[in-house]
């Protein structure tokens, strides 16, 4: 339904339906919806990362297909991160179809404006979403949260009072990614070496030294 309203607004058709579409979309845009809250993060933390930090969509889609194609295309519910990736891929596919349709029915100038706007707004949001959930599946959700908080603190600290290099996700405490039965993955913290127990002395009775013949004299 919202895709239909977006199509009418971008087409700029002078009819009462466009006004209704703007009202409908205005109600949607005024809602304070943050899809990262349930994962312990927020839009604000992700916006601290620069725009060129996130890989392009083709690289993210290829990564998702290479690592989690079985889970994403299966019927089972693996995790909320898998569900979010599915929804992001479906939304981007539908948006691409809308852009294709509008490109065929609008002028070159209008098409260029629309494509630039989509890449700088919705395209960026899809890149952020895919990066966040793929990183949570790869490194662990808690590790990604620590990275976002650390980077947010680093970027807001004046340059003379902060380290020269920004935090890097791969240098944070590592988690071993293991695959459970059923295709799901879980993060396991590295094992700590426990001190080996001391060897107990043999409790067998000591042998008496045999007395030499000279001691009997």
Curated annotation (Swiss-Prot):
The record marks 188-189 as: Cleavage. It holds the Pfam family Hep_core_N. Residues 178-210 have a biased composition (Basic residues). Keywords: Disulfide bond, Host nucleus, Host-virus interaction, Repeat, Secreted, Signal, Viral immunoevasion. Phosphorylated. It is found in: Secreted; Host nucleus. Sequence repeats lie at residues 189-195, 196-203, 204-211. GO terms for molecular function: DNA binding; RNA binding; structural molecule activity. Residues 1-20 form the signal peptide. Residues 166-217 are annotated as: Disordered. Belongs to the orthohepadnavirus precore antigen family. HAMAP family: HBV_HBEAG. This is External core antigen. It comes from Ground squirrel hepatitis virus (strain 27).
